[in-house]
A protein has these predicted regions:
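Metal/cofactor-centered catalytic core regions of large enzymes
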Residues: 1-243
Length: 243
């Protein structure tokens, strides 16, 4: 209702608040919807920047999920690992956008600004460090008897229940539903990147943990491909119309 009295880009900051703990990706769905209605196609570099932002946000969100889950079942050390990596994502957010949480970086028709000098190198450094951290987390949790006792066969959600509840994302895929919009209905050029969509059939807490761990690995893989193939050119459409 608020958006009805705004210019389309004035509404972007409101979408930040949908999940301010995983910034960068929050504006994308709204911007993509407006662009689709207008029949606009983003410049290749603008699309690649959005993919990079979305995958960094995915890593940040999953680090929160894994860390808090581990702490809730008694694995405090893992929480320290995950929040260290999330802090690095926030540092990247600040370097790219000037803000750590409510970034308002996406614009209808492109992005607010291009990558600053040194940003790509900083992302590559983070990806290496994050990959190491994921390995350490896996060592601490994957075969930990106490962790498994508190996660395996707990909170089981069947495939049918997951669908009927309208579940999405990693929780849906942990219940055996092979659905990821990046694969089944690609946007922003996701079809150009090589990555897997992890699926589990158990539908329990441990499966949901495993899905998030593997999705972070796949996000790292995507981010590297984005940086390796980043096209030149503009990051925003040259348009003067109003929606």
């Amino acid at each position: 209702k608020i958006a009805e009295n705004m210019h389309y880009n004035q509404f972007v900051p409101y979408t930040d608040r949908l999940d301010y703990l995983a910034p960068l990706a929050n504006n994308v769905a709204y911007a993509c919807a407006v662009e689709k209605l207008m029949g606009w196609e983003l410049p290749p570099r603008g699309q690649a920047l959005r993919v990079l932002c979305c995958e960094l946000a995915r890593i940040s969100a999953h680090m929160l999920g894994v860390g808090v889950c581990a702490m809730d079942v008694g694995a405090m050390t893992v929480f320290l690992y995950t929040f260290t990596e999330r802090e690095k994502v926030y540092n990247l957010c600040e370097q790219l956008t000037g803000a750590r949480f409510t970034t308002s970086y996406t614009r209808v028709g492109g992005q607010l600004r291009d990558m600053p000098p040194g940003f790509a190198a900083a992302v590559r450094t983070f990806l290496v460090e994050c990959e190491v951290a994921i390995g350490e987390i896996a060592k601490l949790l994957d075969n930990n008897k106490i962790f498994r006792d508190r996660m395996v066969d707990i909170g089981v959600i069947s495939r049918e229940s997951a669908i009927s509840y309208g579940m999405t994302g990693p929780n849906l895929r942990a219940s055996g539903v092979d659905r990821d919009l990046r694969k089944c209905s690609p946007y922003l050029g996701y079809e150009k990147y090589d990555f897997d969509v992890p699926i589990a059939d158990e539908g329990d807490c441990y499966a949901r943990y495993q899905i998030r761990m593997e999705e972070m690995r796949q996000s790292i893989k995507i981010c590297r491909q984005v940086l390796d193939t980043m096209p030149d050119g503009v990051i925003v459409l040259d348009h003067s119309g109003k929606v």
